[in-house]
Amino acid sequence: MNNNQNRCGCGGQPTVMDIERETKENTNFRKEAWTGEHMQVTLMCIPTNCDIGSEIHENADQLVCIVQGCATVSFGATKCSMCDGQRANSGDACLIPAGTWHNITNSGNIPLKVYSVYAPPHHAAGTIQRTKTCDC
């Protein structure tokens, strides 16, 4: 197995990563960490009082794991029917089936650090989105 110190962008090769450390060290809003043929891992850093933005992935299931901070997570069949939100903390996981509207808001006082697994991949390999315009 590849245990490369610079794991991000391993091009779908088998690899071992300290995903908690990689997630905590990430300062980009979104950074692709690994992309295979059927799955992808991204790291996110969401500033206080910001969110990922209401979104839906029609053809991708998603697992979002909170590594640092606390969040409010909303789900719904439509954008207008999203629930008021459930509290999620470090160590919690959000399981989001394809076709589900969702949003994750940083409700804490420190940056929210999460990693996300998409199946199949959702973002282009090598994606780095340094910031998000926060309109929240």
Where would I find each of the regions flagged by the language model?
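Glycine- and acidic-residue-biased ligand/ion/polar-headgroup-sensing regions
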Residues: 59-77
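Short hydrophobic/aromatic-rich beta-strand segments that constitute the beta-sheet cores
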Residues: 43, 73-75, 114
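Double-stranded beta-helix
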Residues: 6-10, 21-24, 80, 105-136
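Conserved hydrophobic/aromatic beta-strand scaffold that supports enzyme active sites
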Residues: 32, 41-45, 63, 85, ...
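A short, N-terminal "cap"/entry segment at the start of jelly-roll beta-barrel domains
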Residues: 1-40, 53, 86-90, 130-136
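Short beta-strand His + acidic residue motifs that chelate non-heme Fe in jelly-roll/DSBH
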Residues: 52-54, 73-74, 96, 102-109
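Short acidic-glycine-tyrosine-enriched beta hairpin
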Residues: 78-98
